[in-house]
Curated annotation (Swiss-Prot):
Protein name per Swiss-Prot or TrEMBL: Superoxide dismutase [Cu-Zn]
Quaternary structure (record): Homodimer.
Keywords: Antioxidant, Copper, Cytoplasm, Disulfide bond, Metal-binding, Oxidoreductase, Zinc
Region of interest (Disordered), ranges: 125-144
EC number in record: 1.15.1.1
Species this chain originates from: Cordyceps tenuipes
Note describing how the cofactor binds: Binds 1 copper ion per subunit.
Entry GO terms, CC: cytoplasm
Function: Destroys radicals which are normally produced within the cells and which are toxic to biological systems.
Length: 154
């Protein structure tokens, strides 16, 4: 079992933690999130970005992690970036808690997400269905109020 954790911080009030667990390279990864400070009753883009570099805030994290050169999509789409985790839904207080299983996100192997950055976006991810070029790259999810580097956990 490999475990990883990400502490999300930013220049806004958005923050939280994301944990990752994977039994073996062929097993799906369980991603559990606990986020606070978002807009109430909203859907916010949730992605893994390529670089673990936050020197200039969340913009230094680069584009979505996409080792297979695909277009942006929903987590259930065949054509998607590895880093496309869709949206998190917030409650009336702007908090989001949940867990997802993802077979493309890996902690083990050549395309591990350890050392990369999780970003919570200020807008809703259109899941690549926005009908424009930016939709196929970013899902038009907007600015990056919070992010954090994924690190190995005990």
């Amino acid at each position: 079992m490999v475990k990883a954790v990400c502490v999300l911080r930013g220049d806004a009030k958005v923050g939280g933690t994301v944990t990752f667990e994977q039994e073996s390279e062929s097993a799906p990864t369980t991603i559990t999130y606990d986020l606070t400070g978002n807009d109430p009753n909203a859907e916010r883009g949730f992605h893994i970005h390529t670089f673990g570099d936050n020197t200039n805030g969340c913009t230094s994290a680069g584009p979505h992690f996409n080792p297979h050169g695909k277009t942006h999509g929903a987590p259930t789409d065949a054509a998607r970036h590895v880093g496309d985790l869709g949206n998190v839904k917030t409650d009336a207080q702007g908090n989001a808690k949940g867990s997802i299983q993802d077979s493309q996100v890996k902690l083990i192997g050549p395309h591990s997400v350890i050392g990369r950055t999780v970003v919570v976006h200020a807008g809703t991810d259109d899941l690549g269905k926005g009908g424009n070029e930016e939709s196929l790259k970013t899902g038009n999810a907007g600015p990056r109020p919070a992010c954090g580097v994924i690190g190995v956990a005990n």
